[in-house]
Amino acid sequence: MAWIQIRINSTNTQAEQMSDYLAEIGAVSVTFMDSQDTPIFEPLPGETRLWGNTDVVALFDAETDMQQIVDLLKEAQYLVESSVYKIEQIEDKDWEREWMDNFHPMRFGKRLWICPSWREVPDENATNVMLDPGLAFGTGTHPTTALCLEWLDSLDLQDKTVIDFGCGSGILAIAALKLGAKSAVGIDIDPQAILASRNNAEQNGVADRLQLFLSEDKPADLKADVVVANILAGPLKELYPVIRQLVKPNGVLGLSGILATQASSVCDAYAQSFVLEPVEEREEWCRITGKLQ
């Protein structure tokens, strides 16, 4: 069966609304692509993280009257005079297989690999975390997750306790446990994140060492040797008192989900309690690390 695809260049503020509307008018699937043609698979819990230049790609049945679709989009003001869009017929494919073929094991630091479950692990002697991409939360494909994974790989986690604040898929907590941590705690505001983290921990054989809490249910006296938070700059600054209290004396902290342009304001908030290391940047994102003084 053939399909017709419409690809519309959009802004991050319109993309989600446009996606919902395309589904309403008959699209069988809608995906987001960044300007480099990369699928956007890694939202933070509770949101779809989109870049300023986002393409919305919708598939329709081959019999669809695409002029009618365009007219509806114009009527809803998702297409205006300056809009850039492209319509093309595409061949039928095994979409699931093609999607799976795009994902390969990824290495972070010296020891750590994140591997899709359908791939062979490249090094059986390495620290391998089995995690499937494209589910709801982070799987290592985004620079902020990669920065956090590399930081965890650089630490001596043997017999340490770890808190993953804003755990999403649980990838950071699970990686820490695989890297030698004694125990870990995942905290999130989203019940789906708690469920995803639990399932992923079971898949990796570490569920007995991972505790999971919704934010409002976390123990008041909870502390750890290592705290990592891959959320956003605004919440990191707002939650400084909460996050600071999670770190044991002489414990270390890793923060990401921060644009490089936001680093100084986040550093200002945390420098009052932490000795901060140089900011690590990747693409437009960064990681801030430090030790509680």
Swiss-Prot record:
Q: Which InterPro entries match?
A: Ribosomal_L11_MeTrfase_PrmA, Ribosomal_PrmA_MeTrfase, SAM-dependent_MTases_sf
Q: Which residues form a coiled coil?
A: none
Cystine connections: none
Q: Does the keyword Transmembrane apply?
A: no
Q: GO:BP terms for this protein?
A: methylation
Under Gene Ontology molecular function, one entry of this record is: protein-lysine N-methyltransferase activity
Instruction: Report the subcellular localization.
Output: Cytoplasm
Q: What GO CC annotations are associated with the protein?
A: cytosol
EC no. given is 2.1.1.-
Pfam families, per database record: PrmA
Please indicate if the UniProt record lists S-adenosyl-L-methionine as a keyword: yes
Keywords of this protein's UniProt record, alphabetized?
Cytoplasm, Methyltransferase, S-adenosyl-L-methionine, Transferase
Q: Give start-end of the signal peptide.
A: none
Superkingdom of origin: Bacteria
Identify the Gene3D superfamilies for this entry: Vaccinia Virus protein VP39 (3.40.50.150)
Query: Where is it chiefly localized?
Result: cytoplasm
Catalytically driven reaction(s): L-lysyl-[protein] + 3 S-adenosyl-L-methionine = N(6),N(6),N(6)-trimethyl-L-lysyl-[protein] + 3 S-adenosyl-L-homocysteine + 3 H(+)
Function, please? Methylates ribosomal protein L11.
This protein's name: Ribosomal protein L11 methyltransferase
